[in-house]
Each structure stands twice: as structure tokens, then as C-alpha cells.
């Protein structure tokens, strides 16, 4: 009985590991539609949190971390637009922060601190200049 139970447990663990490996191989890069959904969810969370008087930086941090975690968990950090390149947690967090603030400015501009608005606009101009080169 002990050996058959041990064999069953070992087989179950190997089977679980194989399923995880197969799942990782089947990850599909995040499309623009996926990114839009995750960005809008983050912005919605940020707006609701701000209106509930949650500290803005904490709310933005949670929204950005969730954005990054979903892309890593569901898409392995891959974004269709970038080809085979996979982004790490930090890059996705930073990209999410920028994109979530941009969307939140459209949804609830009154909830975004002035300094954050100004920083966003400045960074957007820098990116626009960089893309023209």
C-alpha cells in the first residue's frame, strides 16, 4: 500500500510538472487588445482607489504590479508588438505605470495629482521626440 501510494504521488507530481511546462510553451504574446484591457482595468482601479482616498502612489503601485503580473502570468512577459522579446517584471511595471496614468487621465483627470500629470506630459513629449528620430 505504501509503495503504490508513493508511486501515485510521484506520478501526480511529474504529471503536474509536465502540464506546467506545456502551459508555458503555449503562452501567447499579449496583443494590443489584451494590453488595452489590462491598462483600462488598471486605470479603473486607480480611479476608484483615488476616489476612496487610497494614497495615490500606493494605488498606482498596485495597479502597475497587477498589470505586470498578468502579462507575465498569462503571456510569459511577451508582447506581440515586440516580437520574441520578453519583458521582465520591472520593465512591465514601469510601462504599466505610464500607460495606466495615461488612461486614468482620460477617465478621472480630477483624481490625478498635478505633479503626476506634469511628469506624464513631459515623458510623453520626450517619447514623441524620440520616435521622430
Go through the PLM ranges and name each one.
Residues 4-5, 26, 91, 104:
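Acidic/proline-rich low-complexity IDRs
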Residues 2-5, 33-35, 96:
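Short, flexible coil/linker segments at or flanking structured domains
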Residues 14-33, 129-130:
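Intrinsically disordered, low-complexity linker/tail regions enriched in Pro/Ser/Thr
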Residues 61-133:
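Compact alpha-helical subdomains of small soluble proteins
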Residues 11-12, 36, 56, 67, ...:
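Phenylalanine-focused residue identity feature
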Amino acid at each position: 500500500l505504501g509503495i503504490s501510494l508513493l508511486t501515485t504521488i510521484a506520478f501526480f507530481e511529474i504529471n503536474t510538472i509536465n502540464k506546467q511546462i506545456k502551459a508555458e510553451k503555449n503562452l501567447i504574446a499579449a496583443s494590443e487588445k489584451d494590453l488595452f484591457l489590462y491598462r483600462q482595468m488598471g486605470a479603473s482601479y486607480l480611479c476608484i482607489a483615488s476616489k476612496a482616498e487610497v494614497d495615490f502612489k500606493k494605488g498606482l503601485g498596485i495597479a502597475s504590479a497587477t498589470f505586470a503580473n498578468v502579462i507575465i502570468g498569462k503571456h510569459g512577459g511577451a508582447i506581440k508588438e515586440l516580437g520574441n522579446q520578453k519583458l521582465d517584471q520591472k520593465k512591465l511595471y514601469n510601462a504599466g505605470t505610464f500607460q495606466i496614468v495615461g488612461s486614468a487621465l482620460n477617465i478621472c483627470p480630477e483624481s490625478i495629482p498635478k505633479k503626476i500629470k506634469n511628469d506624464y506630459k513631459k515623458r510623453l513629449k520626450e517619447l514623441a521626440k524620440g520616435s521622430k528620430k
